[in-house]
Amino acid sequence: MQQLQNVIESAFERRADITPANVDAVTREAVNQVIALLDSGELRVAEKINGEWVTHQWLKKAVLLSFRINDNQVIEGAESRYFDKVPMKFANYDEARFQKEGFRVVPPAAVRQGAFIARNTVLMPSYVNIGAYVDEGTMVDTWATVGSCAQIGKNVHLSGGVGIGGVLEPLQANPTIIEDNCFIGARSEVVEGVIVEEGSVISMGVYIGQSTKIYDRETGEVFYGRVPAGSVVVSGNLPSKDGSYSLYCAVIVKKVDAKTRGKVGINELLRTID
């Protein structure tokens, strides 16, 4: 694996000079191997090690290199044709392989090659970009998008129209992460490498980036880039110091533990916020 990483790191340093016409065989093979390993879930761009999320930057670099070494090509679809550098993940799947891997894909859901989809996942008509990791038991609902290299945990519900930001455009240092057992409400956006920690519930229409204030109304504490575990979050506003205006924020209205969350439905958690 170290040799593979060395090839990727070296090629990335000279990426501006690499084209599909001049890329060497060693680099092409290394990039293709990494994409295949990301596709199968054997590698992932970020993982939790000793309780902390670690981003493997070289894997992200391999994803970026894949755009340098490949030409656009015609991609056949059921209703149309497409023209892109990245093949579709399920292009060569047959019924036996779908049965073996154990997830559902509802047309016209689109998943790019290099994204991992775990067992018991349901993909409604949605989009999952290259390098993303979607873990077991997760629902990606209609028109939700999972951005490049985003990490989605087990038993997550991404509601209709949710946007989970990617790392490629604009270029971000770390992927957006939704940990296990989270619920992200309809039309919410979580971007720019924000981490939503385990068991959190995000109401509909909440927008969180690195500069968004995440205000805990019980403690007065303000977080940036991280929603603490077990938070129930709604959209809100905080006043300026002189009270002349207010700016958007996300508000943690309560905290719930796994026991409470197991007893109470998501809708009830969001309705009883006073």
From Swiss-Prot:
It is found in: Cytoplasm. Belongs to the transferase hexapeptide repeat family. It catalyses: (S)-2,3,4,5-tetrahydrodipicolinate + succinyl-CoA + H2O = (S)-2-succinylamino-6-oxoheptanedioate + CoA. Pathway: Amino-acid biosynthesis; L-lysine biosynthesis via DAP pathway; LL-2,6-diaminopimelate from (S)-tetrahydrodipicolinate (succinylase route): step 1/3. Homotrimer. Gene3D superfamilies: Hexapeptide repeat proteins, Tetrahydrodipicolinate-N-succinyltransferase, N-terminal domain. GO terms for biological process: diaminopimelate biosynthetic process; lysine biosynthetic process via diaminopimelate. This is 2,3,4,5-tetrahydropyridine-2,6-dicarboxylate N-succinyltransferase. Keywords: Acyltransferase, Amino-acid biosynthesis, Cytoplasm, Diaminopimelate biosynthesis, Lysine biosynthesis, Repeat, Transferase. Substrate binds at residues 104, 141. It comes from Cronobacter sakazakii (strain ATCC BAA-894) (Enterobacter sakazakii). One of its GO terms (molecular function) is nucleotidyltransferase activity. Its EC number is 2.3.1.117. Pfam families: Hexapep_2, THDPS_N_2. InterPro entries: DapD_Trfase_Hexpep_rpt_fam, Hexapep, Hexapep_transf_CS, THP_succinylTrfase_dom1, THP_succinylTrfase_N_sf, Trimer_LpxA-like_sf. One of its GO terms (cellular component) is cytoplasm.
